[in-house]
């Protein structure tokens, strides 16, 4: 296929798609140019079904530093593992396209997005999401798209689609919403305590804007789209399924209704093992035993799936016996750990998270050097999910995509209520350790984070709580669930996480397994989540109503002084010599920003006070009319040089020593002598003249003798 180009304008920027020129061996490939951002997307499918029991979709988002005209950092000077932002963007693209593949589709699919040029005012992630959908849609891969996504901002009561960098910095909302023509199927958002009504309107505005992008994709597919390949879907043997259902459905139904998680898991596993043992013995001589046993496992999974959903939709019974809108038992504890700067333990049913706060000087902020201009990140929220939290063994190592994503969600939820840098000049790190998990652990980490911040004396604007909502839908009827547990998440259609304060929402995240959800479901889920959020905030506020008035004794104390910008170089000194000397003498940490704010950190208040004294001396300026207790440092014929303070000297001219004539300076003053002087002049070069006689009362003039006349 020869190169074909398609052009439109979207949200005030040119959107250009090129097909047929590059990556022609992929099943589908596009080059998307949005503004000056350029993204190459290639989609590839394996020829055979994978052997696993899940859909092996892999989405990558690769940031090439040349796209922003930068050299990669580090010794190797080449791109390494994906950055946190790249990982989050890959997840952002994966989530809306995953539901658009058929049930039972098991071929491996890879969608690789490579950022070739970067424009900070034209979203490369949005272009990559568009390119991913389009590459799949024009390929022979059986993808039931297209989908598209947009960013939505909110400034002065107006919604803005795909805001530029300046607009996003002023926005009260940072929302990414994706979906198909019919419905929304992915949401990721941070917000500055916005109401449910505003958030819902933002979602609908975003979905409305998506229609234009989907129509553009459909236009392109009509011209260059390939015929979809016929692929084998995972299907179980109908006779085998009927046999197992008839024999064991009742037993499995009883097992599913055991309320306690561990007991329920043991009961369902016992039924499954019994069934597997029977059919393995029956077909042990069959050459297709592996396929039969795979079908048996899939049938049992489908039976459990169907029973959980039936109980909720028809009988309104949840696996643990709760009502549809009921939250599991809650518990909140602060100051769980000694020595640390703050800690909070939050428990919701069988989900438990411990959050630990660490405060540090601003010099500890994380430097982010990606495609965007380098910046410093003051607040970090890290999420850890050890396998023991679900009673299992498993991999231990660096954080995976899921842990990075959950940490970022908590970060967005909590950063909206943090004090400004001027109010609280600390770098802040929260680490969430999930100790138990039966669903909604990311939201438990948000609640625990609130407890840790308040226990640590961080003056947050308001407590934040999070709740996960679920959905069971048969296409006609649906049930929205409050505080979903693991089984409801696994077998449900939606995981909709909502975090916020009593004033409004600070973060949203939604993933679904069906094609999309309606505005009515969104509205109901947001209303139900608000009620639940307030219940959780009641428990948090009953435990700790306000942030502790003081920091922990182990936290670094801080004092801030302001100096003139032109004095920064004086405090730092040549090659950092002066500031290093201060730090060596006092043992403190010092941060100086470009505005002249000097932050001094130490656990020793006396060291802070001494540092302030030294810096004040360094930046102090002589003023006309002020009196100083000075020391004579040099004597010349024309006067004496005195040190007023630190590195500021002044000249006391011979005529300013006394009201009477001074013949020789050395007759009156000597080096090392302390004298009081008054500054009388500072010239344009900063040279200081001082006077001793100005502090001495001027003697009266001698009276003239009267002349006698004869």
From Swiss-Prot:
One MF annotation (Gene Ontology) recorded for this entry: magnesium ion binding
Compartment(s): Cytoplasm
Keyword presence, Cytoplasm: yes
Similarity remark: Belongs to the polyribonucleotide nucleotidyltransferase family.
Residue ranges of coiled coil: none
Basic and acidic residues bias (residue ranges): 700-710
CDD domains, per the entry: KH-I_PNPase, RNase_PH_PNPase_1, RNase_PH_PNPase_2
Enzyme Commission numbers on file: 2.7.7.8
Main localization, broad class: cytoplasm
Stretches assigned to the KH domain: 556-615
Enzyme class: transferase
Entry-linked InterPro entries: ExoRNase_PH_dom1 (IPR001247), ExoRNase_PH_dom2 (IPR015847), ExoRNase_PH_dom2_sf (IPR036345), KH_dom (IPR004087), KH_dom_type_1 (IPR004088), KH_dom_type_1_sf (IPR036612), NA-bd_OB-fold (IPR012340), PNPase (IPR012162)
S1 motif domain location: 625-693
Origin species: Streptococcus pyogenes serotype M5 (strain Manfredo)
Assigned keywords, A-Z: Cytoplasm, Magnesium, Metal-binding, Nucleotidyltransferase, RNA-binding, Transferase
Keyword RNA-binding among record annotations: yes
Summary of the function given for this chain in its UniProt record: Involved in mRNA degradation. Catalyzes the phosphorolysis of single-stranded polyribonucleotides processively in the 3'- to 5'-direction.
Protein name in UniProt: Polyribonucleotide nucleotidyltransferase
Amino acids binding Mg(2+): 489, 495
One Pfam assignment: RNase_PH
